[in-house]
């Protein structure tokens, strides 16, 4: 992310250059950013991706034509992580599975600062609806869950990955098929318990 820095400087003999530095967390050392020509009074700083702090300062040191210098340091400001995690891939061990069987999912995900948590969702209608199957810490890179009932030709798994700043990244698996593995159910409705039927008479059976 770009951060705009601006300043005012003048000198009786003329200016030569401006040198920009930053420091974090009250460090004694300022880190060099860049140097610019004397006619400039602003700069767009590309903040390093891994830099996150509640106390950052900018220092500008200005040189004149006879090599005398002076500097000024900004007030403290914060740098927040605004970069979302990236899910490179969601890996399934199969392209076909039955209901009630266990599906193993693995993934590769990265973040500029660090990952915090992962949520795993399942859909059997090509992503129109999702069911949360599990939440876990980012130290894990695999998870298994039991496929719920429901035959499908367009099932998929979605991951939502969060970093420590609350930024989210998303990854979706390839579509896979879910086959029928649910036995039929039957319930006899009649005759009911305690019914007496005479020998040679008809007995009506019904069921659902």
Write out the residue ranges for each language-model feature.
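Conserved structural position at the C-terminal beta-strand
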Residues: 60-62, 159-161
